[in-house]
Structures are given as structure tokens and as C-alpha cells.
Design a protein with these regions (language model features):
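Sec-dependent bacterial lipoprotein signal peptides
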Residues: 1-18
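Aromatic- and Gly/Pro-enriched helix-to-coil junctions and flexible linker segments
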Residues: 19-152
Length: 152
């Protein structure tokens, strides 16, 4: 074996040995972050997801952006009647039960939410930082709704 062949074989063997994976174990789970559902139904959904929809110019009349699953892959929402609320809590739990459109919207929005709202896609994308259009500016009052939800 020539020196060049030996060197190539050694480098290849070292490279192969350095490529390893870490086995997370049998009980690995991704932490499930829970955000206040009542706050979502009574504040976030009506003030952000419904009112802001596509922002100035209403870019899509085809069920308004996120309410059209064909147009959005990240946070597809389902239209439904506004959840009845009083004192910050839904008054009719049947409107938000398992399998309901409202519950699906909560799950979709929670996936793009973070305790540090300034890193959450639900804040970044509509403020134009990671989205093809600006839906609302960073100074919009609805940002406070997102911030408050992150704390709940």
C-alpha cells in the first residue's frame, strides 16, 4: 500500500468514526408548551387572526390567507363563528370542544407561538420580518395581545 493510499484510508476511517448520532432514548418527547386557551379564544383569535387576516389590501379574497389551507402551509386556520366570551372566558364550551374549528385554530396558533414572543413566527411573520408582506407594524396594539398570550 502506498503512503497516499494509506493516508486516504486513514482519513476516511477517521471521518467515518467521527460521524455519530445521539440516541435520545425510549422516552424522548418534545416539550408541549401550553398557552392559555381562554385568552386565545377571547383575545388572540378575534383581535389578531380574524381582524388582521391578510393585512392592508386583503391580499386574498380566497378565504383570507390563513383561512385557506391551500394558500398557507404553516398555520392553516378554519373559519367558524366567533367564540362567545364574557370576562375573558368562553361562555359556551361546546364552541371550543375537541375536534371543533376553534380548537384546531388554537393548536395551529400554539405551534407558531413561543414564550419569547419576539422569536415566535406568529409575531415575526405578520410584522414583515419573515413573510412576503407586512400585515401589521411592530407598534400595532395587537402585538400587546401576542405578548400577553406568551405570558399566560
Amino acid at each position: 500500500m502506498t503512503f497516499a493510499a494509506w493516508l486516504a484510508a486513514t482519513v476516511l476511517a477517521l471521518a467515518a468514526a467521527s460521524c455519530t448520532t445521539v440516541e435520545p432514548g425510549p422516552n424522548f418527547v418534545v416539550p408541549d408548551e401550553q398557552f392559555d386557551a381562554d385568552f386565545f379564544f377571547c383575545r388572540v383569535e378575534p383581535e389578531l387572526l380574524i381582524v388582521k387576516r391578510c393585512g392592508p389590501g386583503e391580499g386574498s379574497d380566497n378565504n383570507n390567507c390563513h383561512f385557506n389551507s391551500a394558500a398557507v402551509s404553516g398555520m392553516a386556520l378554519a373559519p367558524h363563528p366567533t367564540v362567545d366570551c364574557a370576562d375573558g372566558h368562553p361562555t359556551n364550551r361546546a364552541q371550543i370542544g375537541a375536534g371543533s374549528a376553534a380548537q384546531g385554530n388554537l393548536q395551529a396558533a400554539s405551534l407558531v407561538m413561543s414564550r419569547d414572543y419576539t422569536t415566535a413566527p406568529i409575531y415575526l411573520r405578520p410584522t414583515g420580518q419573515n413573510h412576503p408582506r407586512t400585515i401589521f407594524p411592530k407598534e400595532d396594539p395587537v402585538v400587546d395581545v401576542i405578548r400577553l398570550w406568551a405570558q399566560k
